[in-house]
């Protein structure tokens, strides 16, 4: 009977300890906000208060498109030489495959 009472007491103390730890974890992240802050004051001085007043988001069509892209590099040939037909054929075949 004493063993059951000891187990219940340990479980009770463990539950209280976990509950206290969980409630303390949220206190440090809370901010005190005052409603008398004017965002126009910051904007007039060249300061962007991003954190409190929200971020400006880009339109969905403005961002980079997903998918692999291959950037073609333009390398000048020395002496004004023309590229060989074989090289042009390989480059054309690579572009057609993509």
From Swiss-Prot:
Which GO terms label this protein's molecular function in UniProt?
neuropeptide hormone activity; prolactin-releasing peptide receptor binding
Its chief place of residence is secreted
Keyword Transport (UniProt): no
Tissue distribution is:
More abundantly expressed in the brainstem than the hypothalamus.
Compartments where found: Secreted
Q: Where is the signal peptide?
A: 1-22
GO CC, any one term: extracellular region
What residues bear Phenylalanine amide in this entry? 53
Family annotation (InterPro entries): PrRP (IPR026194)
GO annotation (BP), single: fat cell differentiation
Q: Which residues form the propeptide?
A: 58-98
Q: Keywords of this protein's UniProt record, alphabetized?
A: Amidation, Cleavage on pair of basic residues, Hormone, Secreted, Signal
* Database matches in PANTHER family: PROLACTIN-RELEASING PEPTIDE
What this chain does, per the record? Stimulates prolactin (PRL) release and regulates the expression of prolactin through its receptor GPR10. May stimulate lactotrophs directly to secrete PRL.
Which protein are we looking at?
Prolactin-releasing peptide
Please name the source species.
Answer: Ovis aries (Sheep)
Gene from which this protein is expressed: PRLH
């Amino acid at each position: 009977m004493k063993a059951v009472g000891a187990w219940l007491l340990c479980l009770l103390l463990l539950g209280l300890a976990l509950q206290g730890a969980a409630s303390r974890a949220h206190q440090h992240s809370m901010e005190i906000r005052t409603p008398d802050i004017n965002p126009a004051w910051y904007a007039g001085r060249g300061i962007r208060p991003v954190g409190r007043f929200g971020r400006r988001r880009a339109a969905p069509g403005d961002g980079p498109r997903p998918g692999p892209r291959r950037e073609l590099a333009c390398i000048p040939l020395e002496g004004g030489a023309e590229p060989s037909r074989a090289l042009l054929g390989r480059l054309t075949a690579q572009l057609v495959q993509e």
